[in-house]
A protein has these predicted regions:
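N-terminal secretory signal peptides that target proteins for export/translocation
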Residues: 1-8
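Bacterial N-terminal signal peptides
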Residues: 9-21
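Central antiparallel beta-sheet cores of small beta-barrel/beta-sandwich binding domains
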Residues: 26-118
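Short beta-strand edge segments in extracellular beta-sheet folds
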Residues: 121-125
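An alpha-helical repeat/solenoid feature that recognizes helix-turn-helix modules
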Residues: 135-156, 174-200, 219-260, 267-316, ...
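Active-site-surrounding "flap" and adjacent substrate/cofactor-binding loops of secreted or lumenal enzymes
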Residues: 202-218
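Intrinsically disordered, low-complexity segments enriched in small/polar and acidic residues
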Residues: 477-485
């Protein structure tokens, strides 16, 4: 790992240094790297050992795979040929001996009470591992590097896109163990709609949502305050309801409980709280989240009718009123989600309102046939406006390129509203998607937040797949069997 790589890691909070230890004649100053196993996963660790002030040693550690558990060096000591490194407040311990030739440190690695053999080797040049955090999703044999605008375009390869959709959702869920609107949340509110074409979604994702629901149901009533973050509750309810509508075709007890939980934490004005509303477009605006809640209600088989005349029924009407009033919106972007929700929840909007939204979407279509998310709202309109400086500094500000997220979402909304698949404007959008898939199977969308993870590229691939399916441009079943299904 180069020094510039280490500086990069430090800026992202992955690296912590502590200076301790005694002087030893052996020159340990180098970058060292090695692998160990933790819960069946191979994990890689990189150490930078250098001389500090007054002849002491200093050590810096970096896990390449531990995105959410960075290496924090507590102490580093050298005694003769022996070295000892303690990390993360006692969670990790390296005890080793420097080989006679000075090229290896052999010993044991203990992490969370589990001890494994570990050999660290000097690394440099071509042998050094890449900068940490260079991937978007990683879990066992699944690794997707971070998307870039320079990734090569390929001829349409649906299997690559489906593999990414399936594997990315599993990798996020297994690694982070949370419901995230940008990944497994998007999977659960989109993937079931492709059941007829691709087969059922992965049951493991539904099971995870049910487990999350059970944790929510166990939440103490006093903790369900107005500031309670409801994003997860909304996505769990929507994911389970859409699963019922398109996979089992009947309401499950889990879905009924999830919908009850969702309305239990609804705010008095009809929307839901987002505690970290800094991440547009999916985790930044209460109105947009309310459109997801609307999809939950509209999809749950025979559920809404059973709520009439009840307290929950009154809350459903409150949601309708809230959405019809169009409160604080992220420009036209949230109106696209409103049209999608209205198509799945009859009675939310009248035909005239829907046609106005259709016209708005078509007005945003670009010359190349695609749509750009950046034309749908001014920089200050996204979330709390906290990304405006970043967005205004982009070179493409005046002519933003079409992207997978918005092109897919626009086509979904148009088709949901009844615009024919053969409509020339729809076909121009389909043509853009077929020409702009990247080598990894994804469609690229530049993040509105920060140029790092680019998680929007996940919805920016899931949306195009559904859009193509709705336009009759996704191949028949059989082409989309994935590595995930075989694991």
């Amino acid at each position: 790992m180069t020094r510039s790589a280490l500086v990069f890691a430090l800026r992202f909070g992955a690296l912590v240094m502590l200076i301790v230890g005694s002087v030893h004649a052996q020159d340990l100053a180098a970058n060292w790297q090695g692998s160990f196993r933790e819960n069946g996963e191979q994990r890689r660790v990189v150490l930078e050992i250098a001389k500090g002030d007054a002849g002491t040693w200093k050590a810096a550690g970096c896990f390449i795979e531990f995105l959410h558990d960075p290496a924090k060096v507590d102490s580093f000591a050298v005694n003769g040929s022996s070295v000892e490194l303690k990390l993360n407040e006692g969670k990790g311990l390296l005890a080793g001996v420097v080989a006679a030739g000075g090229g290896e440190i052999s010993g044991t690695w203990t992490w969370d009470g589990q001890t494994e053999p570990l050999v660290l080797r000097r690394a440099g040049g071509e042998t050094a591992w890449k900068v940490p955090f260079d991937y978007q999703y990683h879990m066992k044999d699944v690794t997707y590097l971070r998307p870039t605008k320079d990734e090569a375009r390929i001829a349409f390869a649906p299997k690559l896109a489906v593999d990414y959709m399936e594997q990315g959702a599993l990798a996020w869920t297994g690694d982070w163990k949370c419901v995230a609107c940008h990944t497994n949340g998007s999977y659960m509110v989109v993937r079931p709609l492709m059941t007829e074409r691709l087969g059922p979604p992965q049951k493991a994702l539904r099971d995870f949502f049910v487990g999350t629901l059970n944790e929510e149901l166990a939440t103490d009533e006093k903790d369900l305050k107005p500031e309670y973050d409801s994003t997860q509750a909304v996505y769990v309810a929507a994911g389970l309801a859409i699963w019922d509508a398109h996979v089992t075709h009947k309401l499950s007890a889990d879905t009924a409980e999830a919908l009850g939980m969702m309305f239990r934490v609804q705010r008095a004005d009809g929307d839901w709280t987002i505690s970290d509303d800094n991440n547009p477009p999916l985790e930044s605006n209460r109105y947009q989240l309310a459109t997801v809640a609307a999809r939950a209600v509209g999809n749950a088989p025979e559920w809404e009718a059973a709520q009439r005349g009840t307290a929950v029924g009154a809350k459903i009407e409150l949601l309708k009123s809230y959405l019809r009033a169009e409160r604080k919106l992220q420009g036209d972007y949230d109106r696209v989600d409103l049209l999608w929700a209205a198509a799945e929840w009859p009675g939310l909007l009248d035909d005239g309102q829907k046609q106005d939204l259709v016209a708005m979407i078509l007005k945003h279509q670009q010359a190349d046939g695609g749509w750009s998310i950046r034309t749908f709202a001014k920089p200050e309109e996204w979330g709390k406006g906290n990304r405006a400086e970043k967005l205004r500094a982009e070179v493409e500000l005046s002519e933003p390129p079409s992207d997978g997220h918005m092109t897919g979402l626009a086509l979904i909304a148009l088709r949901s509203a009844g615009v024919a698949a053969g409509d020339a404007r729809v076909q121009r959008g389909v043509a853009w998607l077929l020409k702009n898939q990247r080598a990894s199977g994804r469609w690229y969308t530049r993040s509105l937040n920060r140029d790092g993870w680019q998680f929007i590229t996940y919805s920016g691939t899931v949306y195009p797949l559904l859009a193509l399916e709705m336009c009759g441009a996704l191949p028949a079943p059989g082409v989309a069997k994935t590595a995930v299904a075989r694991r």
